[in-house]
Amino acid sequence: MYGAVDRYNRANGRAVGRGTSDAGQQLQQTVDRCRFRAAQVLGASAKEQIVFTLNCTDSLNMILHGLLTPGDHVVTSVAEHNSVLRPLRHLEATRDVTLTLVDVDDAGFFDAAEVEKAIRPETQLIILQHASNVTGAIQPVEDVGEIADKHSVSFAVDAAQTAGHVPLNVEQLGADFVACSGHKGLMGPLGTGLLYVAPGQEKELTPTR
């Protein structure tokens, strides 16, 4: 990774998607190749489902601010990272979004059945971590994916701690959105992140910038 960044800074330095020079085309091919490899690692069916972001927090904010509207209800857990809980509290205060925080046991695990019980008619989103960086608990997100599908509720997974460390297949998770950090298990540079968007779900997101 260091070598690739160094070569870019020394020998290319162009902006992706701008210009038709040989160096610009080479850079575009490199980015396309990275997107394809990221899709392979995450088990996505197409590279177009991968969005490059600033970091995992940025990916999560794109979901929360791009999906939720006044009156929506969100199910999450008390064990989520501040990158989820703080934006949700902000939306609760400014956008009339309501929250249900499912509890966890002494080992840090939530119960998928409790997640299902928290669903209401106005529930728009379930957002949960794949694993905790505090307890190490790897959560039963596949079970929640089935529940979300049954109730036609959008499902987002925070995979900041697992992408690149734990086998991860976004389609098996049944997730509509998966947010990842680029600089942790995926071993990319700081200031990078990924957002997986399931086919068709891009129509549900309002651009945030």
Where are these regions (language model features)?
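Pyridoxal 5′-phosphate
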Residues: M1-R209
